[in-house]
């Protein structure tokens, strides 16, 4: 059997190795050689080349000084552990003067100052010196720096301060509204990936579909712990506030090789996410985030502490003095001091209670009280308007009482309100036995319809359909509530209610229908003109004859025949019948009665006046009317 692998029974397979970025790629080597070759082209032969442009020949002694860009920064105030600290925003990152931090630690304990300086060297924190313009900007606007009598400033980024505090913090400090109720059945799984670049397993993983949340820092958020420590770490079971939890992790700490920027604990709303993204959990988390913002911001002068804050309990790990082997030993020795944790909690509660007794409303709302709050939108303006209506006792109950006293005050206020309401309804019931409470209807989100409508069944069909359509619109608006601000949500509701008819509003307000209007009174009948008896003396025959002739009616007059004689008379040619020249009045009355019996003259009877017959007879005497 030969030594050569060719033809041997045991074939040696080539070693399979995933190519790394540091491997020498022949293509890159060829490109590099071509680049070096083309850069050596000094003669301009008209051929394309990748070499750099030739420098212009200038006279000796002429030097071009290029101005180096330097961001002078913008002065601003930031909050650090409840204290207002001056800072400079350089390239979008706030930088704090280290001299201010040294002065704060010196007032507390000189050992803390030495430990802080050793910690900066151990953590290999990047520190920059302030330029003259930056130094003047801080000294002119900050009285704290002016009182230090310093000639230079050393700036440290807020990201480094935040991450160092997060690495040293074991638990958050107790708040004023702290209680020990940690209900396991009422918690939500949350996670943050603020320090995922420390996780070497995630960085070295080749799985492109791996969820980054699986490698994050996990914890449990308790819903019933608002304005206090509400998140428990899943790994160490430490209790944290949201601002402290995003700086907490259990990755191996790397003192060098990373540059942290943009680390801001006040952005916990964007950094913490719900791991179990069910509708119930997301709705509860969004409500918690919304209620975490106060109605208005205090001014910086009013927000400054009026009294010296009490000394904080030992809830954080001590800062080491040396960076050698004594590091772990100091942690163990200091960690053994806190044995009885419940006793420390009771002491902290007692200290907070004494502190609350010395506080006033001005410590929460400033010297000007609720009138000094400046709203940022209409929703905050409504809240501040309600605060201005409250008396001193109500404001004191809101800000100065303990949680137990506050809950008792709320229950007493609700009971008083119910008693007063029942008394008013009882008085109305005594006056009117048919009185009913006029509580308006309410929209049930789970059912998607309105409840407590007593007059819905008695409403018209169009009104009932309109209320059902309004309920569908309210249900759609409730689905989009997560994407809207509270003020936008209220304006959408008002816009929907503006288009509702008056009868639908009446049904939603539980107002009974209006009684039907009484029928209108019948119109007054015109009084008939008194009918006077017809007499021949009141008839105007002249006017009557003119009306008859104008209407085309011919009066039926009798044919007059000559008297009969016994002697034969000669034959006389007949002539048209005519009235006698001198008829008597009796004959005329007889003829007029015959004419008035005609149906065509019945409509003229009410118009005949007294003496009409006599006038008509006088007219016929002088006028001949042909038949």
From Swiss-Prot:
It is found in: Nucleus. Residues 1-22, 34-58, 299-318 are annotated as: Disordered. Pfam families: c-SKI_SMAD_bind. Its main location: nucleus. GO terms for molecular function: DNA-binding transcription factor activity, RNA polymerase II-specific; RNA polymerase II cis-regulatory region sequence-specific DNA binding; SMAD binding. SUPFAM superfamilies: SAND domain-like. Signal peptide: none annotated. GO terms for cellular component: cytoplasm; nucleus; transcription regulator complex. Keywords: Nucleus. Expressed in ganglia in the head and tail and in the anterior pharynx. Residues 1-12 have a biased composition (Polar residues). GO terms for biological process: dauer larval development; determination of adult lifespan; negative regulation of BMP signaling pathway; negative regulation of transcription by RNA polymerase II; positive regulation of dauer larval development; transforming growth factor beta receptor signaling pathway. Probable component of transcriptional regulatory complex with SMAD protein daf-3. Required to regulate entry into a developmentally arrested larval state known as dauer, in response to harsh environmental conditions. Involved in larvae undergoing cell-cycle arrest during the dauer stage. May interact with daf-3. Belongs to the SKI family. This is Ski protein homolog. The lineage of its organism: Eukaryota, Metazoa, Ecdysozoa, Nematoda, Chromadorea.
